[in-house]
Swiss-Prot record:
The N-terminal domain interacts with the head of the 30S subunit; the C-terminal domain interacts with the body and contacts protein S4. The interaction surface between S4 and S5 is involved in control of translational fidelity. The keyword RNA-binding applies. The gene is rps5. This is Small ribosomal subunit protein uS5. Pfam families: Ribosomal_S5, Ribosomal_S5_C. Residues 1-22 are annotated as: Disordered. With S4 and S12 plays an important role in translational accuracy. Part of the 30S ribosomal subunit. Contacts protein S4. One of its GO terms (biological process) is translation. SUPFAM superfamilies: dsRNA-binding domain-like (SSF54768), Ribosomal protein S5 domain 2-like (SSF54211). The lineage of its organism: Archaea, Methanobacteriati, Methanobacteriota, Methanomada group, Methanobacteria. Residues 63-126 form the S5 DRBM domain. It comes from Methanosphaera stadtmanae (strain ATCC 43021 / DSM 3091 / JCM 11832 / MCB-3).
Amino acid sequence: MSKRSNRSNNKNNTNKFNIENWEPKTELGRKVKDGEITDIDQILDKGLPIMELEIVDALLPDLEEEVMDVNLVQRMHKSGRKVNFRVIVAVGNRNGYVGLGQGKSQEVGPAIRKAVDAAKYNLIKVRRGCGDWGCGCGRRHTVPFKIEGKMSSVSATLIPAPAGVGLAIGNVGKTILSLAGIADVWSMCSGQTQTTINFAGAVFDALKQLSSVKSSEKDLKALGVID
């Protein structure tokens, strides 16, 4: 049984992270609390592993959460049939940062919390620009160039689109791209895209691949890319 959801779990003031109450357990966490690190890019650009969720909460306080899928998973165990909920969650600040995660538990609430935590640990920085040569607006509204991502049987290709086109992709892709701060894109998708975990994974992989493409500073500037 699978249930898709676009329910937003935006943080409200009552759940706002209080850095003063945080006791970091890692050197990276201590640098964040002490103010030595003030920008998430100082971590992501160096490929440093995020081992404490509070690092993300402190540096990206405007992060939003979207539950995309709640799936009931059954498996046989020697003690009988075991039932778990598997939840897929995306997080993002709608301005260049997005994460994807899944969580499993016998109850929906704990599964959602696990998925949110996993998405924060998987947070990435997304390259954006104006990659459609017919547009030339110079704003960061689309992907800077054509890129492909894969997950299991699903392949998702994202193509730059002019401003105003919107997100020409399935709802799962729309959720991830909008959380990443991308407003316009063409797409070509194949495989079992009705499987949320694979479709979401393919789109997320495409966004990760954007940063692995080597381009000259001149070309990136022409595409309006800001790393």
